[in-house]
């Protein structure tokens, strides 16, 4: 009897394990993130969806930025692929976590949205799914590459704004404000000198006709007195 009971328990255990493994093998990504090529300034979306093969305690999706193009190995820009993660692997050492979504159920999806993408956003992104069953955690991941092309118009505008504006005298634009007041002051000083000159001339005394008449009269009296003196001397 004891042997039959042990056989029965073993059969039930392996049956449950087989069913669980069969259901777990049905867990899959229903939507893989795709490689995206965008131009600077555009809005970018990456979609990721996962379906569990059994009743899960919870499902969780995390979006990660793994590394930029300078850190990638040759051929790392290939199509997204599903890869199992090791349980003892430290995910924080793999990149930067961007967002997390957690639900109770068998299906989960999450879109990564990047508005006004820039060149520094280029690189490898990863969708990580944690499937929490009773007594165990299963992790899955899928990757996609974001390629960002430079916006030539934006680059030209940045270069134009960064370069100094040169004038005809080969001085930077920032010196224009200093040059203008000096020229204004110089012209103002010239106007001051030109307007002050008549004032200096006006201070020089001028002889009026009356003063000239007085001078002529005094000379005439002197001559008359001199003549009278000569006549008086002759008569004596």
From Swiss-Prot:
Superkingdom per UniProt: Eukaryota
Regions that span the bilayer: none
Main location: secreted
Positions glycosylated per UniProt: 35, 175
Domain Ig-like V-type stretches: 27-143
Keyword Membrane: no
The entry's keywords: Differentiation, Disulfide bond, Glycoprotein, Immunoglobulin domain, Secreted, Signal
Molecular function terms, GO-annotated: identical protein binding
UniProt keyword Ubl conjugation, yes or no: no
Polar residues bias spans: 184-199
Entry PTM: N-glycosylated. N-linked glycosylation is critical for secretion but not for preadipocyte cell differentiation activity.
Residue pairs linked by disulfide bridges in the UniProt entry: 48-127
A cellular component annotation (GO) from this entry: membrane
UniProt-listed GO biological process terms: cell differentiation; cellular response to BMP stimulus; positive regulation of brown fat cell differentiation; positive regulation of gene expression; positive regulation of lipid storage; positive regulation of white fat cell proliferation
Localization per Swiss-Prot or TrEMBL: Secreted
Residues of the signal peptide: 1-24
Region feature Disordered, mapped onto this chain: 184-206
Cited Pfam families: V-set
Listed PANTHER family: V-SET AND TRANSMEMBRANE DOMAIN-CONTAINING PROTEIN, V-SET AND TRANSMEMBRANE DOMAIN-CONTAINING PROTEIN 2A
Role noted for this protein: Plays a role in the regulation of the early stage of white and brown preadipocyte cell differentiation. Promotes adipogenic commitment of preadipocytes by increasing gene expression of the transcription factor PPARG in a BMP4-dependent signaling pathway.
Subunit structure and binding partners: Homodimer.
Protein name: V-set and transmembrane domain-containing protein 2A
Native organism taxonomy: Eukaryota, Metazoa, Chordata, Craniata, Vertebrata
Gene: VSTM2A
């Amino acid at each position: 009897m004891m042997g039959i009971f042990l056989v029965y328990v073993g059969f039930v255990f392996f049956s449950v394990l087989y069913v669980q493994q069969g259901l777990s093998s049905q867990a899959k990504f229903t939507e893989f993130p795709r490689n995206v090529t965008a131009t600077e300034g555009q809005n970018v979306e990456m979609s990721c969806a996962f379906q569990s093969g059994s009743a899960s305690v919870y499902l969780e999706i995390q979006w990660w930025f793994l590394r930029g193009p300078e850190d990638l190995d040759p051929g790392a820009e290939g199509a997204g692929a599903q890869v199992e993660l090791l349980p003892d692997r430290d995910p924080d050492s793999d990149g930067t976590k961007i967002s997390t979504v957690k639900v109770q159920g068998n299906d989960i999806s999450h879109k990564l949205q990047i508005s006004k993408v820039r060149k520094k956003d280029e690189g490898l992104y990863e969708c990580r799914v944690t499937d929490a069953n009773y007594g165990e955690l299963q992790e899955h991941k899928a990757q996609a590459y974001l390629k960002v092309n430079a916006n030539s118009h934006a680059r030209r505008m940045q270069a134009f704004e960064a370069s100094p504006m040169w004038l005809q005298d080969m001085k930077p634009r920032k010196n224009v404000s200093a040059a203008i007041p000096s020229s204004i002051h110089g012209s103002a000083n010239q106007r001051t000198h030109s307007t002050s000159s008549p004032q200096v001339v006006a201070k020089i005394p001028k002889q009026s006709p009356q003063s000239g008449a007085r001078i002529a009269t005094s000379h005439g009296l002197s001559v008359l007195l001199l003549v009278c003196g000569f006549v008086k001397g002759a008569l004596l």
